[in-house]
């Protein structure tokens, strides 16, 4: 039995590698260079279309841990990245042409891989199937995936608000409440008086935004208005939108605030909060500067900054299992950014797990759920259990991990403890499931 893969980006390439390592053949479809996307320049596999950085290398950084876990699992993407690394301080950056060419050569010349350079316009009947078509999935395939998943669970753009660590919010200022005291006090409210709002407003409308790429120019017409664009419509606009204060009383004053920024839990543990209605296209340093002007967020630590860009992805909390299988048809897998993981390394990690599990399906073995205390397990655990209504793509971060059993003081020691626990857990998991780095 052959596994069919749509897309030879980071996820599809890694999935193909993991499958053939298990002795299972692959039919790999890649439409480039016959049909190009607005961002790609070549027909090579795993082409890096934006930065050449795979981000932080140290284990204190969750993406550094994810890379180390992938190395231990025999990742082709990490093998190529390490072989084609270029100096980048504390980050892992690569020679993008050498990196992509290395991966392409290994897969094209592999005896168990059949390459088809053509666009897939309909969902193939072949199973198992891995859909790893990426953030710039073609219009025809997008329509086909919508038919498979349902239109309500398929998106064309990110519109993600910033997320902050709960422990960095000043609870002497912010207060828990829902409007008019209806239901549970599910929102953490950051109140502003008129002078605080005036300063915040001026900073927001004059802050520097990222320039839009040509293929992203229609983004604002999809119903996801950046908070800074909304603000420029008039000084009162936000007061009738995401910063409206109605139904809320500041317990410090006993009065309704002039404006309120609401924070909502991002995960079940309540270790992260997102700024409700604050989808933004501001540059990251500007987000830090402007959003730290919000009372209660002066010392906020950002898990993720807000982003808005072209990105095809599905509603994974509704559709996927933590194995990256489609709930309604477990012989279909999704992998990469289309699942709602964000970033080069995260996409490749999703491909690694999907590929490993597709091979196991062919072999008559049960798919694996990686431990949630590992980086490679925390990602699918998050994207398949996040609140479906507000789901947006996510990078790997230690905020996704289960809390440590013992309290550890200090951010760096806490991150080191997470990394130690993760690698120990991964080694046990690999031994229990007979996963080896070299085959």
Swiss-Prot record:
Q: Which InterPro entries match?
A: FAD/NAD-bd_sf, MnmG-rel, MnmG-rel_CS, MnmG_N, TrmFO
* Keyword tRNA processing assigned: yes
Q: Which Pfam families match?
A: GIDA
Show the GO MF annotations: flavin adenine dinucleotide binding; tRNA (uracil(54)-C5)-methyltransferase activity, 5,10-methylenetetrahydrofolate-dependent
- Please list the reactions this protein catalyses: uridine(54) in tRNA + (6R)-5,10-methylene-5,6,7,8-tetrahydrofolate + NADH + H(+) = 5-methyluridine(54) in tRNA + (6S)-5,6,7,8-tetrahydrofolate + NAD(+); uridine(54) in tRNA + (6R)-5,10-methylene-5,6,7,8-tetrahydrofolate + NADPH + H(+) = 5-methyluridine(54) in tRNA + (6S)-5,6,7,8-tetrahydrofolate + NADP(+)
Name the GO terms of the biological process aspect: tRNA methylation; tRNA wobble uridine modification
Residues annotated as binding FAD are 7-12
The GO cellular component terms are: cytosol
Instruction: Give the record's keywords alphabetically.
Output: Cytoplasm, FAD, Flavoprotein, Methyltransferase, NAD, NADP, Transferase, tRNA processing
- Predominantly, its location class is cytoplasm
Listed cofactors: FAD
Localisation: Cytoplasm
Which top-rank group of organisms is this from? Bacteria
Database matches in PROSITE patterns: GIDA_2
Biological role: Catalyzes the folate-dependent formation of 5-methyl-uridine at position 54 (M-5-U54) in all tRNAs.
Task: Identify the NCBIfam families for this entry.
Answer: gid_trmFO, PRK05335.1
What's the family? Belongs to the MnmG family. TrmFO subfamily.
Supply the name of the protein: Methylenetetrahydrofolate--tRNA-(uracil-5-)-methyltransferase TrmFO
Q: Which organism is it from?
A: Heliobacterium modesticaldum (strain ATCC 51547 / Ice1)
Q: Give the gene that encodes this protein.
A: trmFO
């Amino acid at each position: 039995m052959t596994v069919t893969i749509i897309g030879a980006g980071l996820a599809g390439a890694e999935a193909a590698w993991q499958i053939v390592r298990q002795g299972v053949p692959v039919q790999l479809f890649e439409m480039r260079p016959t049909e190009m996307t607005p961002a790609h320049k070549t027909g090579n596999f795993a082409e890096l279309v934006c930065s050449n950085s795979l981000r932080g290398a140290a284990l204190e950084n969750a993406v550094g841990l994810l890379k180390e876990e992938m190395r231990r699992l025999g990742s082709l993407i990490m093998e190529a990245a390490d072989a084609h690394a270029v100096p980048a301080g504390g980050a892992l950056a690569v020679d993008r042409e050498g990196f992509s060419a290395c991966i392409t050569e290994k897969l094209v010349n592999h005896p168990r891989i059949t390459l088809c350079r053509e666009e897939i316009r309909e969902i193939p009947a072949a199973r198992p199937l891995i859909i790893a078509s990426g953030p710039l999935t073609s219009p025809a395939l997008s329509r086909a995936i919508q038919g498979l998943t349902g239109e309500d669970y398929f998106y064309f753009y990110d519109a993600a608000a910033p997320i902050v660590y709960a422990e960095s919010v000043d609870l002497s200022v912010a207060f828990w409440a829902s409007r008019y005291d209806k239901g549970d006090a599910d929102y953490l409210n950051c109140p502003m008086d008129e002078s605080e709002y005036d300063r915040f407003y001026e900073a927001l409308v004059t802050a520097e935004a990222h320039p839009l790429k040509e293929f992203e120019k229609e983004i604002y017409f999809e119903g996801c208005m950046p908070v800074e664009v909304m603000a420029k419509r008039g000084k009162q606009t936000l007061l009738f939108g995401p910063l409206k204060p109605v139904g809320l009383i500041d317990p410090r004053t006993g009065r309704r605030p002039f404006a309120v920024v609401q924070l909502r839990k991002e995960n079940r543990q309540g270790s992260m909060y997102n700024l409700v209605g604050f989808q933004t296209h501001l540059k990251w340093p500007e987000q830090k500067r402007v959003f730290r002007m919000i009372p209660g967020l002066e010392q906020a630590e950002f898990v993720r900054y807000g982003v808005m860009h072209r990105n095809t992805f599905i509603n994974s909390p509704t559709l996927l299992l933590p194995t990256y299988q489609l709930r309604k048809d477990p012989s279909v897998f999704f992998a990469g950014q289309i699942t709602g993981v964000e970033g080069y390394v995260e996409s490749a990690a999703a491909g690694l797990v999907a590929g490993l599990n597709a091979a196991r399906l062919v072999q008559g073995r049960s798919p694996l759920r990686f431990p949630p205390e590992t980086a490679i397990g925390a990602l699918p655990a998050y994207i398949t259990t996040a609140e479906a209504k507000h789901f947006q793509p996510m990078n790997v971060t230690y905020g996704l991990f289960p809390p440590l059993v013992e309290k550890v003081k200090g951010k760096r020691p806490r991150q080191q403890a997470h990394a130690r626990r993760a690698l120990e857990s991964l080694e046990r998991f690999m031994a229990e499931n007979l996963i080896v780095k070299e085959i």
